[in-house]
Amino acid sequence: MRKRTRMDLCCALGAALVAAFVMTWATLTGAKAQTAETLQSLDDAWWTGPLVSYSARSLPQGHILIEPYFYDVSANRTDSIHSFTYFLYGATDRLTVGIAPDIAFTSAHGGADSSGVHLGDTTLRAQYMLTAMDPARGIPDLALAVLQNLPTGKYDRLGRTSDGFGGGSYATTLAIYSQMAWWMPSGRLLRTRFNLAETISPRVPVSDASVYGTDAGFLGHAQPGNRFSVNTAFEYSLTRNWVLALDLIYNHGSATTARGFHAAKSVHIESGDSDAFGFAPALEYNWTANFGALAGVRVFPAGHNTNASVTPALAINYVH
């Protein structure tokens, strides 16, 4: 009998969470319609948010959000363990700004591990809420966001390829987020999100071994491909404290190229376009309206020019 791997266990966990979500969906859609008096109130539902999608709701002015994520990307015979933390601040009731640094370590099966824990790239973000959700009038939360990548992670001149945790690019992401709450026939709330994002990356100077597949002695540049993503999410409020969540994800990446010279010879490396579809079931638990935890797994089957990956994740969400 084949030994069960971590990826097998994570896939089994993801399948179990998806099955729980589907069974709950079937139950709630088959329930009898409730009267207005028995509908769950918006204040009675506490949320941390799903695993992948961003919230369109801004923080109230003067409030802060701290949300550390801990996750392990298991793909292509490597495990990359990350700690990624959001620090967000409500500059006004409609404008939220923040920063999200990343630290990581890679364990390579059959290869060299990272030389230690390293800093990855850092993201600056600003988000402006255009409308505030009003379910009675059919108005969703709607926001525009700008994310700026700071290339704080090492990406070239690598002694070990497992030390590459950055991209070297000042990439800019433009996004639109929406969020809405719906009352299901069971009377419980279902919150949905829909995100669209486009990432544009400028050219990057590259020397020696790098995350772009170049070797020691290379001198040239890389052009990361632009990325487009679509994400929709569903959260069902089981009780005030417990929430089932599910993200559905599509990512498209344009070809990434590296051009330059190695040992006086011209070098051209191209990855080709890529497409990936994934899902991320999760379970939320909220101790209060401002403090909760989230556990789940993000699964990407192998796609067009993409490897299969399984990423178990845990997050703590605190608003003050």
Where are these regions (language model features)?
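Outer-membrane beta-barrel biogenesis signature
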Residues: 28-68, 73-74, 134-141
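Short loop/turn motifs that connect adjacent beta-strands in outer-membrane beta-barrel proteins
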Residues: 54-62, 77, 94, 132-141, ...
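Residues on the lipid-exposed face of transmembrane beta-strands in outer-membrane beta-barrel proteins
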Residues: 66, 85-89, 124-128, 146, ...
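Transmembrane beta-barrel strands of outer-membrane/channel proteins
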Residues: 68-72, 99-103, 144-150, 192-200, ...
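Outer-membrane beta-barrel translocator domains and adjoining extracellular loop/strand segments
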Residues: 77-82, 107-114, 154-161, 203-213, ...
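Residues that define the transmembrane beta-barrel architecture of outer-membrane proteins
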Residues: 79-85, 117-124, 140, 166-174, ...
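Detector for outer-membrane/organellar transmembrane beta-barrel domains
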Residues: 163, 167-264
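Outer membrane beta-barrel transmembrane domains
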Residues: 217-320
